[in-house]
Amino acid sequence: MIYFSDKELDDLLLEDIYRGDLTTHALSIENIPAKILFKRKNAGVVAGVSVAEKLLKKLDIQPHLYVKEGEWVESGALLISAEGMSEQLHQAWKVVQLVLEWSCGVAQYTAEMIANAKSVNPTAVVACTRKSIPNTRKLATNAVLAAGGHIHRQGVSETLLVFTNHRNLLSDPNDWTKIVDRLRQEAPENKITLEADNYAQFEQMYMAEPDIIQLDKWLLEDVKKALDLLQSKQKDILLSVAGGVNKNNVSDYAKLGIRLFITSAPYYVPPEDIKVVIEKI
């Protein structure tokens, strides 16, 4: 489970309720005991319930959870219920709903992409990038993990990944062996990934024997050529594909023999529909 600090939870709440609920106050219904229900409209994967629970508790509402992160539910399934005064419930309503809707959307797409990849290659791994919508990375990470996905990397300090923009600043940007040797010396605990923009680059860099070569925005036929070359040279280098990889084409790459898929696609899908009902006790 991803840890969310009090500040992060407060920031989510204060974006919507920084001056209270004017409508509830104007109708003088703040102190009416009530209950709130959150239901998933369509069948699918659930994510965000752990964050939703914390948000409700921040408003002194004690929630009841009926599902766990990553659980598959039927349409209309009750995810969370809670009881409290109308004022608190109305303040919680939209923030919790949005967290659930967006998280479930990310998780649903991730789960479908994983299923498509594993239908061809049971060892396939779908890893999501750091290219999330700004200020949503932790929510996105929580949703991806709930769906059974992996994280490519959370930030630039986590892995060694050499892009062309790094090499542009080197005195000899095409000395792949020197680049790999330097990285092995400076960060011996980390695997080394080089990104190949095209097949011509790949033909040069594979001889330096990095741990992983990431193929960015490659056509299927070029990916196959790269795989065939490594096999013919008996090089034990893992290939990953990135750039435009989504649930609709992941199986095409898997059929070639790729097992590591780098994607940002889950972050930009429509949210799932979470129905919310508030009613008197």
From Swiss-Prot:
Pfam family of the protein (one): QRPTase_N
GO molecular function: nicotinate-nucleotide diphosphorylase (carboxylating) activity
BP-aspect Gene Ontology terms: NAD biosynthetic process; quinolinate catabolic process
EC number(s) recorded for this UniProt protein: 2.4.2.-
Lineage: superkingdom: Bacteria
Keywords, comma-separated and alphabetical: Glycosyltransferase, Transferase
Transferase found in the keyword field: yes
GO cellular component, one term: cytoplasm
Cross-referenced InterPro entries: Aldolase_TIM, ModD, NadC/ModD, Nicotinate_pribotase-like_C, Quinolinate_PRibosylTase_N_sf, Quinolinate_PRibosylTrfase_C, Quinolinate_PRibosylTrfase_N
Keyword check for Transferase: yes
NCBIfam families referenced in this protein's UniProt entry, alphabetically: modD (TIGR01334)
Family membership: Belongs to the NadC/ModD family.
Protein name, per record: Putative pyrophosphorylase ModD
Organism: Haemophilus influenzae (strain ATCC 51907 / DSM 11121 / KW20 / Rd)
Gene that this sequence comes from: modD
